[in-house]
Amino acid sequence: MKKKTSLSEEDQALFRQLMVGTRQIKQDTIVHRPLRKKITEVPTRRLIQEQADASHYFSDEFQPLLNTEGPVKYVREDVSHFELKKMRRGDYSPELFLDLHGLTQLQAKQELGALIAACRREHIFCACVMHGHGKHILKQQTPLWLAQHPHVMAFHQAPKEYGGDAALLVLIEVEEWQPPELP
């Protein structure tokens, strides 16, 4: 294939005259890749869907049978009762706290669902839910909702340093973390 030049012979001669004593630069070091935006945040649509899925389990019509005497507590059938004892003694310290003060029941359900979804996503085993005293509506409903969720392993009235009888410590079942497979 024949090279086409767009410069006249005079211009080419002038260019060569000006370039006397220079040498061509070698590009042998770095190849620049085009900049791409890294996606580090989970898309908000997915987060909203996770929260909605997690709050789907909470029903006001179904009321699980919980012991009404003594502190509020619950343990799933396949979980050891020793976990309740460890929660009561304060062996677990919560990594996430949820404050339900001032929320409606619908908002509280959504926030509980969001808390459980966040714990599973971040591999957090123990969380604290502060329902407060108030008119005792959320104080009564929160344990009933938590007992219905399949990812809640156990909950117990929180020790005094985490809110006492105005809060619950919740153990959440998280998936085992596995390192990614190498190719």
Curated annotation (Swiss-Prot):
One GO MF term attached to the UniProt entry: rRNA binding
Annotated InterPro entries: Smr_dom, Smr_dom_sf, SmrB-like
Keyword Hydrolase in record: yes
Protein origin, superkingdom: Bacteria
Domain Smr per the UniProt entry, residue ranges: 98-173
UniProt key word Nucleus: no
Pfam families: Smr
Gene3D superfamilies: 3.30.1370.110
EC number(s) given by UniProt: 3.1.-.-
Keyword annotations: Endonuclease, Hydrolase, Nuclease, RNA-binding, rRNA-binding
GO biological process per UniProt: rescue of stalled ribosome
Family to which the UniProt record says this protein belongs: Belongs to the SmrB family.
NCBIfam families in the record: PRK04946.1 (NF003432)
SUBUNIT field: Associates with collided ribosomes, but not with correctly translating polysomes.
Physiological role: Acts as a ribosome collision sensor. Detects stalled/collided disomes (pairs of ribosomes where the leading ribosome is stalled and a second ribosome has collided with it) and endonucleolytically cleaves mRNA at the 5' boundary of the stalled ribosome. Stalled/collided disomes form a new interface (primarily via the 30S subunits) that binds SmrB. Cleaved mRNA becomes available for tmRNA ligation, leading to ribosomal subunit dissociation and rescue of stalled ribosomes.
Protein name listed in UniProt: Ribosome rescue factor SmrB
Organism: Salmonella paratyphi A (strain AKU_12601)
Taxonomic lineage: Bacteria, Pseudomonadati, Pseudomonadota, Gammaproteobacteria, Enterobacterales
